[in-house]
């Protein structure tokens, strides 16, 4: 990536920047980064409800993630927060924690890169920044839930790929079958 990129934690005053990046569709199918945070019934309420709920999370001051800026404009997003912020992980047969009571675990749960900035290494830059950020916030370990595309391609890459996480120093932690595996590293 040749452009200078600045990475900042999402804060209430940068909510409009996230909205500009995500657009009317909330990044992906009206998600607004709520897939891992909500029940299936809440998720089914759709785009506007997800947007409102995520705005409430952001304005509460709870950690949510990092925004990447190029030339002052938002171009990328990485969700990173304490694992307990993502209750859907605890219900997932493939991703549920081996020890749900383990403390100090932070999760990198998704990425969104503006179309004009894809395939330039920004996802890796955001992942490295997320690990550093989680460490500064007290994380003992950082988890990710990437898709393994080494044998079968996938169009569902919002959580990243195994190769991306391997390149960033993560190691496989849990693989229970399915498309995603749990990977970890220490900050």
Where do the protein language model's features map onto the residues?
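Conserved donor-binding loop and adjoining core beta-sheet/short helix segment
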Residues: 24-43, 69-70, 74-87, 100, ...
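Active-site rim helix/loop that mediates acceptor-substrate recognition in acyltransferases
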Residues: 32-64
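Conserved GNAT acetyl-CoA-binding A-motif
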Residues: 127, 134-155
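Conserved acyl-donor/pantetheine-binding loop and adjacent beta-alpha core of acyl/acetyltransferases
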Residues: 56, 69, 73-110, 114, ...
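C-terminal "cap" of GNAT-fold acetyltransferases
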Residues: 155-168, 173-187
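Conserved acetyl-CoA-binding loop-helix of GNAT-fold acetyltransferases
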Residues: 108-113, 119-136
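Conserved N-terminal entry element of GNAT/NAT acetyltransferase domains
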Residues: 1-36
